Amino acid sequence: MSDVIRLLPDSIANQIAAGEVIQRPASVVKELLENALDAGASIIRLDVREAGRELIRVTDNGKGMSQSDARMAFERHATSKIASFQDLFSLRTMGFRGEALASIAAVAQVELLTRRAEDELGTRLTINGSEVGEVATVTSPQGCILCVKNLFYNVPARRKFLKSNETEFRHILTEYERVALVNPQVAFSIYHSGELVQDLPPSPLKKRILDVFGKRMEKDLIPIGIKSPITNISGFVGRPDGARKRGALQYFFVNGRFMRHPYFHKAVMAAYEAIIPQGTMPNYFLYFDLEPSQIDVNIHPTKTEIKFSDEQAIFKLIGVVIREALSSSNAVPAIDFDRKELIDIPAYQGPGKNVVRPPVDLDPSYNPFKETGLTEPIRSSRRQSPDMGWNELFKQFEAKRDAEKMAEPPIRSEGLFASTDFTPSAVSATPSTDMLCYVHRGRYLVTTLSRGLALVDFHRAHKRILYDRFMADESRRHIEQQQLLFPELLEFNPSDASAVKAAVDELQSVGFDLSPLGVSSYSLLAAPVQIIDCAADVVRDVIHTTLEDGRSSHEQMLELIATQIAEYQAIPCGKTPTAEEASDLLAELFASNDSTYTPDGKLIVSIIEEADIARRFE
């Protein structure tokens, strides 16, 4: 039998390696931007076409490469960053494995134009699927221009699984922003299909954050800083009142590299505990600077997972620096005691003053135990109140209360739910007043079914009802619009402009009036009358959810808008409904096509079977 183990060709090996390093166009952008930074570039331009499918081009003014280096750069494990294993523990560069360019060249058509400052002419190199094409000497500006065309052209399965252009471009913007935020001294610009999306000049860190995410954040940023033998921490954290339910801006950077660290995120959240509303997230931009020997970045090909030698100490340090920053900036309100009712106590005058005993009236002949005859009845020591007719008033109150009880619907009956097994078809949509309904802890309704007891979360039930009403009104185009007394300014991330515009177009179709004020700013002029008081919050939540989930179709957007409107308009938890409100709510809920779950998938009704109830008393 012949041997079956063989060595794979370099082209196939590179395509396999590319599966780990190059997952989508954003992966290419990340690697090329980091290479430009490692080359010492101070100006970097990123051009993208068709969300990176057709073209990704990075132009920089870095050191450039010689012709031999340009050819060697596309070989696997070829790098200028390390020469020995010990160099891994003193890394200050972004790349070091020598895998990125080889992986990119394996799944795309690559063209490189480069020149060093000391060379008169540069080099032009083309590679198609790991196959080197033309290598020529040409005129070229200093630095590098690296073009990646037709990504995954030779791996159709990978190209087929790419998302929509909007989604892929958002991933590109995310990588671009991460690199820009940690290198404020470098000028960045990004173009999509020839149109300028964002231009970032060199600037201080705070201005770079504002340039990326909008000037609206200026009042939200609180500077932090601490130096210790373990690590130096700097950056900004958000004010508690700027915490968001969705779309919080949360970034960790270590030694100029973006990272994800769930453990450190817990430290941040612990510092904000009890000072931000439950379910919200604070903004933060934390930069760690420590010796490279104290971290290990060689864990994952994307280098976003990093291990620290003393994570527990850094965890505590994060909590200390954030709490100190919040306290010193008055972001956490201090206790202010009212001094009006304080007793005026004179200050102690010192030992030189004689202490005088205050005069006290004393009867030395008084004996509390002396027996005396009772000459008159003992009177109560309590003060006697004049007869104000309280008894008569109480009787009138009881009579009035009895009359009100007679006017109320009976609370016990076998009417509405006696013959139903929790199916909408068996329930009349007409509100019934003949039912058993009990409110538990101001949130849950307890009612009867033929199968047993139903526990209903009335806040969620109201959400389902409002959602159904909105969808029915939208289908009939009966949404009533109301003008805001004062238009409200809404600002979004400039890099999300295209996705925001798509969401705004859908909002316009369901009763919102949003007027553009620039690339990523809008003025909210009108909204559906039901949510006029919280219209701006609804718009923000809809857009942030769209950016996170990538919803784009009309049906998806409509469902999202209806869900957010129902969330804000529903009866808040803790507000007890009246008997009539509870009856109407239950009747309309069970008439719904889906009375079991809210639009976002949360349980509304839990049933305790009759058999389970009987079993408890056995």
Swiss-Prot record:
Gene3D superfamilies attached to this UniProt entry: 3.30.230.10, Histidine kinase-like ATPase, C-terminal domain, MutL, C-terminal domain, dimerisation subdomain, MutL, C-terminal domain, regulatory subdomain
Family to which this protein belongs: Belongs to the DNA mismatch repair MutL/HexB family.
GO MF entries: ATP binding; ATP hydrolysis activity; ATP-dependent DNA damage sensor activity; mismatched DNA binding
Source organism: Porphyromonas gingivalis (strain ATCC 33277 / DSM 20709 / CIP 103683 / JCM 12257 / NCTC 11834 / 2561)
Pfam families: DNA_mis_repair, HATPase_c_3, MutL_C
The protein, known as: DNA mismatch repair protein MutL
Function: This protein is involved in the repair of mismatches in DNA. It is required for dam-dependent methyl-directed DNA mismatch repair. May act as a 'molecular matchmaker', a protein that promotes the formation of a stable complex between two or more DNA-binding proteins in an ATP-dependent manner without itself being part of a final effector complex.
GO cellular component, as recorded: mismatch repair complex
UniProt record, GO biological process: mismatch repair
Gene: mutL
InterPro entries tied to this protein: DNA_mismatch_repair_CS, DNA_mismatch_repair_MutL, DNA_mismatch_S5_2-like, HATPase_C_sf, MutL/Mlh/PMS, MutL/Mlh/Pms-like, MutL_C, MutL_C_dimsub
